[in-house]
């Protein structure tokens, strides 16, 4: 009996010791119940079962760093297949993962610069620049008792902290809407484009949790509440917005002293754009945009203390960069409900960190290396945060790996490889004081991996899997319910329902891998003329009616919403109403392609041929280093010049334009100058599904862009799918008038029936590819003009477009610089058609584009 009692006692004590050593496995009652660090109060949809009020630290791996031993700036990983890990993982995290998390309501911090904008403008009270203006009414602005940000000209030395170099301002809050004190931050924007907006302030004892910031952007305004009780003395991200070039109150930020609480509102600098690296190491700065640098340099620019920025005291930037990602996370989270015992923190309730990496390793048999997870449970502090077991990190890593395989295979119908979960001593999983994981997404050294990994649809699917894992993990950690945000709607179309009123209509998209991702409402976003998109209106039905003001081009995009958040948007569609118009032109958007560069993959060679076809990223891409030069498969697994995949660095720092899904806007703008016509638009999918009666339209403008079946993309694209051909044929047979433009509309039609259709209906034949991409001139129609044909940052290019020749009674209307046909026109008693083998939206000059469009429409409409 005594032995049995002793055994029982031993087991009980052991269990207690185990629990004491490892801690609880969920947050239990530990939770943050206050207001979020940042909230967009202009968001039209409510999120109740997503990641609302969850604060996360997410980053892409590595970045450019200074090697003090060699006295040079360098990448942390080698150049392979047109990229390096330092560049590649950003292309998953920034355009896909972070927006998905934010669409679910999360507040995301990242210790590397997140804005692919090379310009930077700072407006601050300490600057002589006159973009800062205070107004004191009932309450007066005064200096805070603690230092603030100040900027000086030129670069910054190691250890220099800009957030203790100046002053900050404060004012007592006011509950009433009238007689508010305010600060206006009005920058001079050097170039029109998208700019991240960061604010800064100082946290005081009586700081309010709902400081009101208003961002004015291209004629729109978006309101934010910032919780100034946390996160003072660093850059706080509000969002990314379209700004016009120049200095205007329509492109500014306003901070007021309005609050629901009695307290203090503080003001410091506001930053527009990511900018260039400005931390000098050795004798120079990196010379690259800040978004390409490692976290070590961003954390310094963001005001982190020296023991966060550089644990080596400036002697080892490589180690500092790895450590600073986690240390800044801890610094921000210190003093919050999740890290209550950490002193001198910023009280931001960050509760999870994730490092997104890619890995090395090859498979000579052509198989995949796949995904690996990493956690640390045996090193570091025995527990995390408020007594949480390190096993919570292992659970996160395991779920990330398992779900990646499940979601990729189910969504893309491919086989995906996963490895395991390593429980090892890595800085990015040892140092964070909250649950953390490293996700090695794939092998950047193994071409079968990176061939899939550079497909934008793969990146979207992987990022969505990571987002869903974090969503479900957080629900488990807090014992709450979750709903997955929907996918973007499809079959978007606009039609007139009366003389001045149009109807926008769309369909929900199902998610085969997630039953909760069902939309319950939709956000309709509108842009009129040259203004930016508004903040949207939330509607319950899958349609929306709106009356148009005449003479203005309206642009629309739709997102799907539910309790879990908001989807990515649809393509942009456009509409235009002309007073007295009796005829309507329909624009069909048939350009949806997203792809990697051209693929070479045989027994002798592997790689991406960027010169032949650079592919199409979602909106844009800063992840390419340069053109691959070594395709020799026998050099697999090596590094340096002799390695398979080695290439140049001529594209480093370039944000290459991709498919922004808004080219109906450019066509509608050009068509609005052509005559007395109304204009509507639709997705090609709506036509293919029989949802559009083409016979209602006087003229159809089919936008194909760079659409084609490239043979390697994970999603099937085609310029003229059989269903679209059938609808266009029927339209033309009824005396229709058709304008078609696209780079590959002829080469994409190689089947005998396809070539016959081109000949019989478009009156064109394929005459090879026009390979002289560096001569962009096109001539004809009484003029000559240039088009985008090469990799650039302004607009996707018509890379190696088709030469086309006329058949029957058609004629060549435009030619490339070498004399080959670039456009074919046909007017018969049966129908009229005008075909260009380059996208009209690629014409560089908008005024020339308008004139060319007017000439084409005049030709097609004339009798």
What is each model feature region?
Residues 252, 269-277, 352, 358-380, ...:
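Active-site-adjacent mobile loop/cap segments within catalytic or ligand-binding domains
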């Amino acid at each position: 009996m005594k032995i049995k009692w002793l055994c029982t006692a031993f087991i009980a004590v052991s269990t207690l010791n185990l629990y004491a050593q490892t801690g609880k496995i969920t947050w239990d009652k530990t939770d943050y119940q206050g207001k979020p660090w940042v909230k967009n109060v202009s968001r039209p949809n409510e999120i109740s079962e997503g990641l609302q009020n969850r604060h996360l630290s997410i980053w892409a791996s590595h970045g450019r760093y200074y090697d003090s031993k060699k006295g040079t700036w360098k990448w942390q990983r080698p150049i392979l297949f047109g990229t390096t890990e330092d560049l590649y993982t950003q292309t998953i995290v920034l355009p896909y993962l972070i927006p998905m998390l934010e669409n679910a309501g999360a507040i995301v911090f990242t210790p590397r610069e997140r804005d692919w904008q090379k310009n930077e403008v700072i407006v601050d009270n300490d600057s002589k620049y006159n973009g800062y203006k205070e107004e004191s009414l009932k309450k007066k602005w005064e200096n805070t008792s603690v230092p603030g940000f100040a900027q000086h000209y030129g670069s910054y030395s190691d250890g220099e902290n800009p957030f203790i170099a100046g002053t900050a301002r404060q004012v007592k809050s006011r509950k009433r809407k009238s007689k508010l004190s305010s600060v206006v931050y009005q920058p001079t924007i050097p170039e029109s484009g998208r700019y991240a907006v960061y604010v800064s302030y100082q946290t005081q004892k009586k700081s309010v949790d709902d400081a009101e910031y208003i961002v004015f952007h291209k004629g729109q305004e978006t309101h934010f509440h910032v919780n100034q009780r946390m996160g003072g003395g660093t850059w706080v991200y509000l969002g990314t917005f379209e700004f016009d070039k120049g200095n205007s109150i329509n492109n500014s930020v306003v901070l007021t002293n309005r609050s629901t609480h009695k307290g203090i509102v503080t003001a410091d600098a506001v930053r527009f754009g990511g900018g260039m690296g400005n931390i000098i190491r050795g004798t120079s700065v990196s010379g690259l945009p800040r978004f390409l640098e490692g976290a070590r340099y961003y954390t310094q620019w963001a005001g982190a203390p020296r023991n966060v920025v550089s644990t080596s005291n400036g002697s080892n930037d490589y180690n500092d960069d790895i450590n600073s990602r986690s240390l800044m996370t801890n610094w921000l989270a210190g003093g919050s409900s999740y890290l209550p015992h950490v002193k001198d923190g910023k009280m931001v309730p960050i509760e999870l960190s994730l490092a997104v990496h890619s890995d090395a390793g090859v498979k000579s048999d052509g198989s995949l290396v796949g995904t690996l997870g990493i956690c640390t449970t045996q090193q570091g502090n025995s527990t995390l945060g408020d007594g949480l077991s390190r096993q919570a990190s292992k659970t996160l890593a395991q779920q990330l790996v398992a779900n990646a395989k499940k979601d990729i295979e189910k969504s893309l119908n491919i086989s995906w490889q996963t490895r395991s979960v390593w429980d090892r001593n890595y800085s990015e999983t040892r140092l964070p004081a909250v649950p953390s994981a490293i996700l090695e997404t794939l092998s950047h050294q193994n071409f079968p991996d990176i061939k899939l990994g550079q497909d934008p649809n793969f990146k979207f699917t992987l990022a969505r899997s990571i987002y869903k894992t974090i969503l479900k993990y957080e629900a488990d950690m807090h014992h709450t319910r979750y709903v997955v945000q929907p996918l973007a709607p499809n079959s978007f179309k606009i039609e007139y329902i009366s003389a001045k009123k149009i109807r926008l209509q769309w369909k929900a998209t199902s998610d085969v891998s997630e039953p909760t991702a069902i939309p319950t409402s939709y956000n309709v976003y509108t842009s009129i003329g040259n203004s930016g998109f508004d903040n949207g209106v939330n509607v319950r039905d899958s349609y929306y009616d709106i009356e148009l003001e005449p003479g203005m081009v309206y642009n629309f995009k739709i997102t799907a919403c539910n309790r879990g958040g908001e989807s990515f948007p649809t393509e942009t569609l456009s509409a235009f109403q002309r007073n007295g118009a009796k005829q309507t032109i329909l624009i069909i958007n048939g350009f949806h392609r997203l792809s990697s560069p051209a693929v070479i993959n045989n027994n002798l060679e592997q790689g991406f041929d960027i010169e032949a076809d650079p592919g199409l990223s979602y909106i844009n891409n800063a992840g390419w280093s340069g053109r691959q030069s070594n395709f020799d498969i026998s050099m697999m697994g090596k590094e340096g010049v002799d390695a398979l995949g080695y290439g140049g660095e001529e594209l480093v720092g370039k944000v290459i334009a991709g498919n922004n899904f808004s080219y109906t806007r450019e066509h509608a703008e050009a068509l609005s100058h052509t005559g007395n016509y109304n204009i509507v638009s639709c997705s090609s999918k709506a036509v293919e599904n029989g949802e559009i009666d083409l016979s209602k339209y006087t003229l159809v403008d089919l936008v194909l862009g760079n659409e084609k079946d490239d043979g390697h993309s994970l999603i099937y694209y085609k310029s003229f799918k059989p269903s679209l051909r059938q609808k266009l044929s029927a339209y033309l047979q009824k005396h229709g008038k058709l304008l078609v433009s696209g780079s590959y509309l002829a080469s994409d039609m190689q089947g005998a029936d396809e070539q016959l259709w081109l000949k019989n209906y478009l009156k064109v034949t394929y005459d090879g590819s026009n390979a002289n991409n560096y001569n962009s001139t096109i001539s004809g129609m009484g003029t000559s003009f240039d088009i985008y044909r090469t990799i650039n940052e302004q607009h996707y290019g018509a890379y190696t477009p088709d030469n086309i020749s006329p058949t029957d009674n058609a004629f060549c209307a435009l030619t490339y610089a070498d004399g080959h046909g670039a456009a074919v026109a046909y007017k018969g008693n049966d129908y009229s058609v005008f075909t260009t083998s380059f996208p009209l939206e690629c014409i560089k000059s908008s005024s020339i584009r308008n004139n060319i469009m007017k000439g084409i429409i005049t030709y097609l409409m004339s009798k």
